[in-house]
């Protein structure tokens, strides 16, 4: 199956299925000499793992990572880094009723028509379970970006269903299971999810991600633009149906006199472009928003067809996230970090010695 690798110089190839013995990834292109332990990776995996609150899937996976290669005496060697996460709480019997039937909104039908075979247990390869290795690889990327350039990649939930979550402070994000930057909204989010679970339904979410400290110059026009690669990576996350960079779709209603970010000796006056111009980073914060659709696995009976093309009714059982967006923040952060480290290495390879006489201005004039 092709399409399992992300990146050009810093590559990540994932493997495994939701109910297989293990999942994992192979990272190639990581620079040598960086300190790296399983604890460095585990801290990020623990932010994404299931079973952490009543609002997410109750599948109990420890998601304990094993570093199989690429690290010697706690230091990266420059050779491929293999990460392994063993599946320990599969419950395949929950999927016995969909062996011959396609679940609406899932990849069951498309995988079957493309490959002529599918692993029906938890969605197999198409499961969001496969985002765990992405978060593991993202931990490596985050560490290198932070230590080498001071880049910080952080995210938060900015909307759940009809509820907007206004940003208050980053310190709130780690204090609740929603990654909400506004502690005052958390009780409303909890009540909303409790009612949704009783209804046997699901809902979508919006996640915002910000990368600060990114230098000017990263990105490869025309077809490997930084924002294009970010959009591709974000759309590779399960259930993501929309991506915005900067002002995004709000740009439609903005006039050029408003949208164009003016430059002054003191810095940029605005950041409607989201930190990217011409596919190249400006030195400002890179701002990304993603829209995540409602979970397709719900208890409400829905119409579908069987492999024979006959009408069928599907009721989904098993342990599922009523809103996959609740655990998506560390995944989106990881995807952004993976794109950034790849472009950092590509920039260093081609333009690392380039210097200009023009001062690098601040990301914000204020």
UniProtKB/Swiss-Prot annotation:
One of its GO terms (molecular function) is FMN binding. The keyword Ligase does not apply. It catalyses: 5-O-(1-carboxyvinyl)-3-phosphoshikimate = chorismate + phosphate. It is an enzyme of class 4 (lyase). Keywords: Amino-acid biosynthesis, Aromatic amino acid biosynthesis, FAD, Flavoprotein, FMN, Lyase, NADP. Signal peptide: none annotated. Coiled coil: none annotated. Pathway: Metabolic intermediate biosynthesis; chorismate biosynthesis; chorismate from D-erythrose 4-phosphate and phosphoenolpyruvate: step 7/7. FMN binds at residues 125-127, 238-239, 278, 293-297, 319. Transmembrane segments: none annotated. SUPFAM superfamilies: Chorismate synthase, AroC. Its cofactor is FMNH2. InterPro entries: Chorismate_synth, Chorismate_synth_AroC_sf, Chorismate_synthase_CS. Pfam families: Chorismate_synt. Belongs to the chorismate synthase family. HAMAP family: Chorismate_synth. This reaction introduces a second double bond into the aromatic ring system. This is Chorismate synthase.
